[in-house]
Swiss-Prot record:
Gene3D superfamilies recorded: Head decoration protein D, Insect antifreeze protein, Single-stranded right-handed beta-helix, Pectin lyase-like, succinate dehydrogenase protein domain
Active site: E695
GO molecular function: ATP binding; metal ion binding
One Pfam family, short name: Pect-lyase_RHGA_epim
Disulfide bonds: none
Ligand binding (ATP): 746-795
Name of the protein in question: Pre-neck appendage protein
Keyword Metal-binding attached: yes
Residues under site feature: Cleavage: S691, D692
Residues bound to Mg(2+): H285, E310, D312
Lineage: Viruses, Duplodnaviria, Heunggongvirae, Uroviricota, Caudoviricetes
Comment on protein domains: The N-terminus has three domains that function to attach the appendages to the phage, digest the cell wall teichoic acids, and bind irreversibly to the host. The C-terminus is an autochaperone that aids trimerization.
Cofactor or coenzyme needed: Mg(2+)
Subunit structure: Homotrimer. Each appendage is a homotrimer of gp12*.
Gene: 12
Amino acid sequence: MSTKPELKRFEQFGEMMVQLYERYLPTAFDESLTLLEKMNKIIHYLNEIGKVTNELIEEWNKVMEWILNDGLEDLVKETLERWYEEGKFADLVIQVIDELKQFGVSVKTYGAKGDGVTDDIRAFEKAIESGFPVYVPYGTFMVSRGIKLPSNTVLTGAGKRNAVIKFMDSVGRGESLMYNQNVTTGNENIFLSSFTLDGNNKRLGQGISGIGGSRESNLSIRACHNVYIRDIEAVDCTLHGIDITCGGLDYPYLGDGTTAPNPSENIWIENCEATGFGDDGITTHHSQYINILNCYSHDPRLTANCNGFEIDDGSRHVVLSNNRSKGCYGGIEIKAHGDAPAAYNISINGHMSVEDVRSYNFRHIGHHAATDPQSVSAKNIVASNLVSIRPNNKRGFQDNATPRVLAVSAYYGVVINGLTGYTDDPNLLTETVVSVQFRARNCSLNGVGLTGFSNSDNGIYVIGGSRGGDAVNISNVTLNNSGRYGVSIGSGIENVSITNISGIGDGINSPVALVSTINSNPEISGLSSIGYPTAARVAGTDYNDGLTLFNGAFRASTTSSGKIHSEGFIMGSTSGCEASVSKSGVLTSSSSKTSSERSLIAGSSTSEAKGTYNTILGSLGAVADEQFAALISASQSRASGNHNLILSSYGINTTGSYKVNGGFEKINWELDSLNGRIKARDTVTGGNTWSDFAEYFESLDGQVIETGYLVTLEKGKIRKAEKGEKIIGVISETAGFVLGESSFEWQGAVLKNEFGGIIYEEVTTEDGVKFKRPLPSPDFDPNKNYIPRSQRREWHVVGLLGQIAVRIDETVKQGHGIDAVGGVATDGDNFIVQEITTPYTKEKGYGVAIVLVK
């Protein structure tokens, strides 16, 4: 007996016909094709069938050869004739044709009715057990328990709302309508397409949600690999519409940072819809490598944390593209519970949220308060092209939670690039439109446009305090009547950059400021404000015309530079400049550097500020060695003492402290601030014609003596001189030098020796400078207000030497001497009259002459 031939083509016949049918025949009914294109598709389809038929004929000939060689011809003929007479052969042909038409194995082939009444669960189970692709035709197919999906399942329907799979009213609690067979370790290679899953939650009564874990969703995929879900509608769900999760019926809570074993992965959800759900429409847990695109989730049954799309505990590497949500608590919520790892590395490429409470809500529960541990997993969300339309909470979700366009809590590494928020009813959202809060950090909001939120407190608010956000970049924002404060930064926020903010506030209810920050150290630039009373309010100070603030190392208009400290700057300079320490800078200079804090070099070259609080201006080759040293227009010079200033000099080196020096190649003058002394190498001249030397004297009677009177001494005080008395001087207004003013303190403020010399003590300043300081007098009261002699009526400037204007009578002659009568000069033997400048008149009672007093 010959060996029975292997009929490989017969074994694959059903699968091949299905593939050909799926690929070619439906195009004949595609109205987007022209008639010529339709005909070409059909002809190509028939040609492919012909190829398969030829191969089948070749294998059938092998069968016939085997039958004939082994003498089985009579048996085969007899069997075929009996099948034909009994109708079995005809039924077989009809069944094959029907299954081909229904795209694989139809559930009706296995007895399904699809009449909305009959329990079709066994038909589904048998069809799936056949191993062939299963087709669900038009109809409502009732099932009394969940449908299990083994590996390598293909289940395709006649379309959403055409092919409906629905729970019967008799189904109890805990069942999911459709789920993979092995809920612990999972299955693989599952394809679901084109039907509706109706959870019939109404059978359980009003307000019923899931009993716990991942049970009671319309579609549950647990621990599966390679799952494609397309054109599925999930309605009236007890828990979720579609749930992608790890193995097991209960969601694991293993602590932050610990993901569950057996994740689902390589999941594709496309063009699906969820509505009437009790928790979330489409959700993921502890799974990875998931794509969700072109889906619509809307109008949940309940008002708890019911989100259109929820990427939950332990989910990672998830991409959501061009989806839409409506009427949910969260349009997209990316989150985790406190004892589970947060969803991370999530990408959103386009989403439209319509009338959700919080269109985009990113949070890690249990990690928001200042006393909570910092989340280790809430990281990496990138979202672009987000749209939020009329966010509101008319239904009272989450105990009347406040609406938001976007809320970020506890996450770090969040990038938003393109977010549009719009409302035509400003009363729907009256608090904050976009918030970064509750320990969120390292977030970037770029390309944000908000329109119509004219009753809201804040357009964008980085909430401060002990659990505030931090490290936030806000850029390229357009605010159209949105927020009394356009961008608001709370207290304690140390790292914020706000750039290119444009706001129109003339339609806002009581606008305050386009940008407002509690702290004084944000980075701010590029503000454009219309209709706001002030463009920027920083640390309580208003800047009506805008403000530019930068933090960190700063270099501008500079070809190249060396090291710049984070609190240093170099501007308008050429190569070789450094500002390597904090609070230092180099401006319009070359080859210059600051080496100590709080130092500045400007308009200089090859100079160095080595000490703290150094300043070098307009100098070449200048060096400031110690603190509080300065060189201004001083080249090739060195200031080596504390509080030392060199002005307009060349080639001098100074030591000592609290001094001002100048010179050329040597020191030519010095102001000693420590001791109040002035030194000059050459002549000291006056800048006017004043020509006498004077001292302060007190009048004997305490009254004013007018200018030009000759005075004498009595009891150490002055009065008008009389004839024959010793004239000491003249009351003068032209003294070039005046001594004894006691300008700064009471003359008895310090102790003096018997000769009037000051008694000193040696002290050391806080910066280490040693010097001699006058000993304070125990009789001196520093709390008393001191009035200098120049402001007291009893004290007078008396010219003692020089050319002084004197009151004269009619006897005085040029070239003669003078005497005094009642303080008025008369002809005598004292001094010399140089010139009579105002002749004597009886009306005035005196004249004026210039007298050389010596």
